[in-house]
């Protein structure tokens, strides 16, 4: 039943007796019986073992049920533009679950106090389990009235004479560099700008208002592009792709609520 050989049981008993400092069993060629000290020890530990088994069963039951509180940290752009509009589907599917969500694009200690984190960029934390959700293109865009005033770039180098809406790298505190990919070609351009932001939705709003040219993920830009509020520039140089990953800390089977959220986010990402 325990999966131990007789010699293994004997060694385990010997270690236990050495640990407690008393002889727990009387051994004879015919039988093994409890000593008086062994009977007292058995009477004291039996309720504790029963409580431990009950706690283990409770924990296993909780881990198998999608309920309780799930704490997640999600990239602001993905949270606002893709995930939030679909949350009613998630909460309807799991009525016993409370979703406690914070938004952040910082990667340092991103798992502090949360069960799942969702971030753009390649995985760089070996201790975490990373599930790739999607890849999205990086587009360069501007408002039509800005392009009417300043002209439309026809090559990446033309942006050196334009005003950029810059986005701050949360890891370095400096603006992200602007890269352009076309086939095997890679071009980096030093784009100047007097506005630096750390929230992509605010940066898009500034771009729509005519502040300048902005680089953004294609994911979530559809409404502005479809309405004509934003126009893509340099479409031939838009092959750079950026991944989105979901992270959780355990290499063992995660609780059901974590698996449910990961599967839902994967589902949402596939339809984005």
Question: Each predicted region: which residue ranges?
Answer:
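C-terminal regulatory
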Residues: 108-113, 123-244, 270-272
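A bilobed periplasmic-binding-protein/Venus flytrap-type ligand-binding module shared by bacterial periplasmic
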Residues: 244-253
